[in-house]
Amino acid sequence: MSARLPVLSPPRWPRLLLLSLLLLGAVPGPRRSGAFYLPGLAPVNFCDEEKKSDECKAEIELFVNRLDSVESVLPYEYTAFDFCQASEGKRPSENLGQVLFGERIEPSPYKFTFNKKETCKLVCTKTYHTEKAEDKQKLEFLKKSMLLNYQHHWIVDNMPVTWCYDVEDGQRFCNPGFPIGCYITDKGHAKDACVISSDFHERDTFYIFNHVDIKIYYHVVETGSMGARLVAAKLEPKSFKHTHIDKPDCSGPPMDISNKASGEIKIAYTYSVSFEEDDKIRWASRWDYILESMPHTHIQWFSIMNSLVIVLFLSGMVAMIMLRTLHKDIARYNQMDSTEDAQEEFGWKLVHGDIFRPPRKGMLLSVFLGSGTQILIMTFVTLFFACLGFLSPANRGALMTCAVVLWVLLGTPAGYVAARFYKSFGGEKWKTNVLLTSFLCPGIVFADFFIMNLILWGEGSSAAIPFGTLVAILALWFCISVPLTFIGAYFGFKKNAIEHPVRTNQIPRQIPEQSFYTKPLPGIIMGGILPFGCIFIQLFFILNSIWSHQMYYMFGFLFLVFIILVITCSEATILLCYFHLCAEDYHWQWRSFLTSGFTAVYFLIYAVHYFFSKLQITGTASTILYFGYTMIMVLIFFLFTGTIGFFACFWFVTKIYSVVKVD
């Protein structure tokens, strides 16, 4: 069973000096994952049964999580399948992030004693009579799950139990999940894990992995009297048709279930467990062997270098404009009494009387800016905490919990920004503004999320959010976020309107006919290309984490890409804004928001490409769920990038018109 495997279906989401040091510690490299335990996830000590105490346990509990598949967006709880169930045991409490991600951790019937070897121990036996409708339904669900390659996810001491095997490129891959079973097609083609053994050869037959060999590695605590700590748990799934079910010996042919089987079918579930001391692995670095088999770090460095090249290119362009062109423009404007010739050459000064003219649909723009500010700050703080190790994979659900809590608490800056800009746009309907800021964008996201949840409920998936959790989310929104938004809006409207460096003329200036490149749409389309070029490699790993259930842990890289994205959006927008001002087009507000916000359209196009080229998802429900959740991500990303572009352009316009003399 240790035969080499091809790659199976992917396994399963400027404080310069200080910041540089933090990022260097957070960027993953060889043996770097020890930083994951900064928040103080306490280790558990284990002892032999005769030495156990309150500080040193002998019993090792194995927990089971939801089962998922790369061929379906629908995960299912362990109890949805007809596997061996725990007779007793308390279900661990789950945080908000775990519930939103669909994690359902439950106790299992697999119980171990530290350092006690067990061989072919029977867990339970399941019997099916194909003539009984209930049994047939259970068996068909099991077959369908094997056909879609659903994967178990087991947990020991808050660590995933991994299945390690060789892949085609000679690398050792450790999968934090293992399949229920596999299928040989009616043409004799081995699907998924059926390639691991030549014993799986019967056509149109399912083979269920009803036995696991588990090996638990431990490291003795250096003090000696404190027992040992678990540093790894690995398993190998196997299939046996036990001849003596009451006394299984874990030998013989594999457990096959023909697609046309009838009569009585018995499946005995067994396991073997052994323990091995490993003094090379420390508890703080026990995730390394899993993370080092994840997508290669050098690809991430290529992504960073690619992004930095784009940033340097844009920075050079912006620096040339700011330091050379604008400097000369301003000097010549300020020196000339008769500016007729200068106006023909330097067009951006001509629009000084219209540059701060309120935009059309100023209400909507201010609402978008408020929500975008909320998302921008939330993303920055979440990624910063993730870099420090507080939101590592070991701290399950912490990333989503942190993001949701921050979004709720950041209602105040959202209301403040929306109110300040709406007032500067000359708006007077402050009640409408604050209500839209509180409910428009969050309402769209929640409506989409609720529709997706209805589909999950209908499919019986574990990813369906319980009614109580939905009520809790609504309570956080209405009882905390909305009042905080009103408070922020109150202070925003109370302050004086933003003072602009130049006065606005009463009569709008006529905008001359624009060339193709200075028209709004071409500029907006071009503006999103470079920011997207900075993130598309990182985007691949993020989508893999969400849809292919791979473990994402490279938050140092992600934070660097976040900073680069902010810089790129800002510089690309400033660059295009300058060209449009030189063409005497002063409608910069919406254009600046849409220029960088158009990056989200490229995100959507890439997500569509990813769905058809990388995923193996089948089924109408899974397809709707994929694109439904993708639209939520696209909207959030649109508000995030659009807000960056607007603020950058607002700063640029304010800066250049504040240093030029205007009669």
Swiss-Prot record:
Question: Which biological process terms from the Gene Ontology are attached to this UniProt entry?
Answer: ceramide metabolic process; glycosphingolipid biosynthetic process; protein localization to membrane; regulation of heparan sulfate proteoglycan biosynthetic process
From what organism does this protein derive? Homo sapiens (Human)
The record's subcellular location field reads:
Endosome membrane; Golgi outpost; Cytoplasm, Cytoskeleton, Microtubule organizing center
Renumbered to this chain, the signal peptide range is 1-28
Among its keywords, does the record have Signal? Answer: yes
Membrane topology label: Multi-pass membrane protein
Q: What is its main location?
A: membrane
Q: What is this protein called?
A: Transmembrane 9 superfamily member 2
